């Protein structure tokens, strides 16, 4: 049996938590998502089910078996397939009326302006170690007055930061500048989750390898990220509810059953953050030494 798609019917169960007129607003919003792997893919599908009608999506990578533990599009049938092709197809299966602009080469300095054209909100789905393009993307969002959300899968939970127009920027919060990638990685971890709820239950620290750009991950964390990020997106796009911008942050850890709200004026320049970074450098040096990297 062939079914005819109807937007109102497809997203009718949103109504109640979302007003009918708000659903129409969401239908005409455009969200940019860079990276369609661990969090990016599930961000796209979750926001599709919220009824967002337009997306700019970017990813240059292909699915591999190492993606099976967490990535929405990773299956036996998609091994070797382009992530952007798989996720675009899945999104169009949810809403065939999507206004979908695809960037199969990923986001680069040369296409960044096109990627952010007509965008109402940017949701970060980039790989943790994609420092250069992440830095450029968030800077471009700040310049254009585009709100941006980063939701990081940490342990078995999520850490979320909102960067809103006219408020603290990504660079002001993390303080990356021209620092080496290893220092950017440390500042990213410490800045994303100042409460550090996840630190006590990592059972095999040797699996954290910043030098080889490999860290452990869980599907639960990615799913939680998508739920929180989509809720923040709803509030930002509809202009209702409380949206706390950086230097405010939020970390929810399902393993511990704990929620922490943080406030770090100055971002990583805050005294508590400076102490955490100093301790982190010592721990990172010891870890890299144990792994034979230094």
Regions found by a protein language model. Give the residues of each.
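A conserved mid-domain beta-alpha-beta active-site/ligand-binding segment of alpha/beta enzyme cores
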Residues: 170-224
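Phosphate-binding loop/pocket of nucleotide- and phosphate-handling active sites
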Residues: 1-17, 236-294
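Hydrophobic/small residue at the entry helix of a nucleotide-binding pocket
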Residues: 39-40
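Glycine-rich phosphate-binding loop and adjoining beta1-alpha1-beta2 segment
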Residues: 54-95
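Oxidoreductase and adenylate-handling cofactor-binding alpha/beta cores
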Residues: 165, 224-241
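Conserved N-terminal Rossmann-fold NAD(P)-binding element of oxidoreductases
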Residues: 33-35, 58
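ADP-ribose/adenylate-binding Rossmann-like module
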Residues: 121-164
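A structured beta-alpha segment of the ubiquitous adenosine-cofactor-binding alpha/beta core
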Residues: 80, 84-121, 125-134
